[in-house]
Every structure is written in C-alpha cells, then in structure tokens.
C-alpha cells in the first residue's frame, strides 16, 4: 500500500507542475560563452503577459447589474402570486438612497397611509394603513424592542431591520404567497415605513388626473430624488443584510469611473454629457436615466376610476390591483431591466458637466476635479479617500507570487517578472523603459508608463477587448489551461479509483487472512461455554471424537451449546 500511495503522490505532484507551466515559457536566459562560462550576472527584467486588474475586489459593489439585479428608478423586477393573480413587486438587492415618490399637484406625502373608508382618494398616500397591531410607521427603537427575543434580528443594522420587518408580513387572502411589501427608512427620524403600494410611477391623462380639485380621480405620481428625500432609503424585500459591503452608498470624491485596459485605468470614451450645477443634480440626472422596470403600455380598461375608488374605501385588493399592484405590467409588456441602464456618472466639478454611461466601470481614475456617482448612491454624501497604494500593493503581491513560483519550480532565479501595471505612486517600481509621465490632477502623485505597448483596447460599445495581434497568444493560453485542468481532473479521478481498488483489495485480503489465522488458536477450541464460528484445525478433537481425516482443507464449523 505504501508503494501505491507514493506513486499517487508523485503523479499528483507531476500534474500540479504541468498545470503551473506557462504555454510560452522560455528556457533559461543564462548566456554562455564558447567555453561554457556564464557571462550574465545581472537579473533579467521582463514584463508578464498576464493582464490582472488590481481594482477587481474594490469595484464589485459598483457592478450594479450583479449587485442590484433590478430596476432603480422604477423597481418592479419580480413577480409574485396572490390568489390566482400575478403581481409585480420591487426586487432590488441594494437600498436606493434619496429615492421617494412625488404625488403631482398634491401636498400629501407618499409616506401618508393610503386612503380608506370615506376618505377621498387623493387624501391618502402610499404607506400602510392603520392596523390593530401597530406595524407602520414604527421607530427603530420600538422595532428592536419588538424583536429583542430574536438574536439574529438584533444583529441587523437599521436598514436591514426595517426591510426584514416589512417583509415579514403576508397577504391575509393568501398566506402562502411570496408577495412582500417594500419599505422606506427615514435615517433622520429613524422611522421605518411599510408601503402598501408597490407601484412607483403612474403618468399620462389616460391613466391619472393632475387636477388637484378632483379628489376622487386617480392621482399621478413618479419616482424622484429631490432635497426632501435626502434622508430616505427605498428598500425592497431582497435588500441584502450586509448591504454596506455589497452596495454603493457614498459618492467617490477625487475619482472618476474608468475601464481597466492592460495595466492602466483609462477614461470611458462613449458617454452622454449633461449640464449640472452640482453633485445633487448630477445624481438626480443619473437616477432619471437609470435602469427602470416601468411598463411602457397599459391595458385600456384602466379607466374605471369608480372601481379603484371603491377598492380603497372597502380595502378590496382586487379592485385596486390594476393600478397599484400591477398585474403582469398591466397585461401588456412585462419588462424587466435586470439592472441594465445608465446607472453611473462622472461629475466634473470644474466645468459643471455630468457624464453618464451604461457600461460597467472596472476601475477608478484619480482626479481631483471629479466625483464618481451612481443611481443608487446618496445624493450628497462623498468619500474623498482615494486608495492611493492600490497599485503599489498589487505589484508587490504579484512579484512575491512570481518569486515563489520560481523557487518552487527551480526556474532561473536570474529573472524578474514584472506585473502588467503601468501606473503607481512609486515611480521606480514601474521599471518603465522611458521616463514615466506625472499625472497633474492626481491627489496621489501618480506616475504612468506610456511607452509599453498595450495588448488591449476599448471598443465602440465601451467594452475592453484584446487586440487582434495578441488574441492568438491568449486563446492558446486559455486552451492550454483548459487542457491542463482536464489532465488534472483525469489524474485525480484515476488516482481516486486506484486508491479505492487498492483499498478494497487490501481489506479483502486482510479479512481472508484473518480467517486462516484462527487455525493457530487450537487451545481455545472445545470450550463448552463458547459459541463461535472458527476454522477447524486438523489436529483438533471435539467432544472426544477422533481427529478429522482432512489435513489440507480447513472447514468452517459451528460449535453447539451444551
């Protein structure tokens, strides 16, 4: 067995070494003379071909399509069954800071409870009506008192607790429904509001009336980020509990979003520019242009205002669902954005221009005249701390990794492999073949090496792609990597099978030998109080009988009780 394990171990080591090898790995670069004497003593410096992005982890929360996965301006990204009907409900995974609902030509706040009983339709808002159990609005202090026996809820931050509270209530008419109410959290007053209505926009003379005097007509409303909503956060049932780590909140000062292109963060070339007097206005503009799940068409039957009025007065969900609990986007277009839209912007504080774009940013450019913002971000809060050491730290990590690989595989140690990072606040670490250029607007004192040929470029759709002349190298490397991975998987699978077969053979042989070993235990035979199945020794004599004739074939016998 030890030999088998040694063989398997050596095979695994061989496969690991094969997996680590680079497809275009060059032989040792030691140069010899005619007499085989080493001429080069200085280590050779070369540039790695691997294109890694030091911003990858930092920028994960700004991948809004992945982190939020639903509309922002209007969030109706999920369907829920209630009874026999399908409703659209908010489903975003991140809070939308500063978002509220404006009821046009009305002084009523959307956080006012919906109209019930004899109230006029326009006297109410969107919030949950009064109930026997006071569940909304409710302060965070009272929420923590309410759930003090639940340690898991007590660990949640205020926004997560508000969302969880609102999502804990089910429809009376269908307790098995996945329908859950959205919520709004007031950070100034520390109050949690449950929203009775999931709809966020209803516009157009065909569907609503802006006439403030007509109190019983359907009111018009739309989402907005204005100054009165700065302290609010709109929450769906899907907001993650650790949203601080996974979602953007503060805008990024001294920064603008960019695209990582083979060693440097470059500006996004294709953008929409809009004049904006300040950051708040730019944030509001990007919110208006952001991902939206709002349907573009509605069913013609949405003109029966009397039915909707009665629905509110009688608290009849079936009557009001056409307007406020949208049934499959009003049975016309069930559009879901999945978070795709103009969700990002760079605000130029000097020229007062807001640059919008719909491509996921992959890095940050350090620029003292810019602020990077998103449609999810707070309208005013700014974090001015730029991670100045990110490039230097990544270069040191990459070089330590290369050094370990060289030591492990006995690669020529007279070789230094530099990572493909051409920007840093440590000019000497760039090892640039030309004089590095100093970035004037940088608050981090960055230098960039512009004389190394880039292997990637930005296309017209703001996507980064490898240049044609280098594609074959990376395709070959990817193919080799897949082949090596396949070899490793095959090797591991084969090794497991060999170990299993060897183990089975070993234990079967051991069990077989144990049976024969009992033939040497003649002294124990014939004891009247013992009942065992044993192999009969040819010299044994049971119960006064003569010896057995067979001296070659052991026989399994059972001793009777006396």
UniProtKB/Swiss-Prot annotation:
Spans through the membrane: 485-507
Protein's recorded name: Apical membrane antigen 1
Recorded family membership: Belongs to the apicomplexan parasites AMA1 family.
Keyword Membrane: yes
Function: Involved in parasite invasion of erythrocytes.
Organism: Plasmodium fragile
Compartments it resides in: Membrane
Disulfide bonds: 94-247, 162-192, 208-220, 265-363, 282-354, 388-444, 432-449, 434-451
Residue ranges annotated as Cytoplasmic topological domain: 508-562
GO CC list: membrane
Gene: AMA-1
Keyword field: Disulfide bond, Glycoprotein, Malaria, Membrane, Signal, Transmembrane, Transmembrane helix
S-adenosyl-L-methionine recorded as keyword: no
Endpoints of the signal sequence: 1-21
Residues exposed to the Extracellular side: 22-484
Membrane topology note: Single-pass type I membrane protein
Annotated glycosylation sites: 84, 176, 226, 405, 441
Region annotation (Disordered) ranges: 519-543
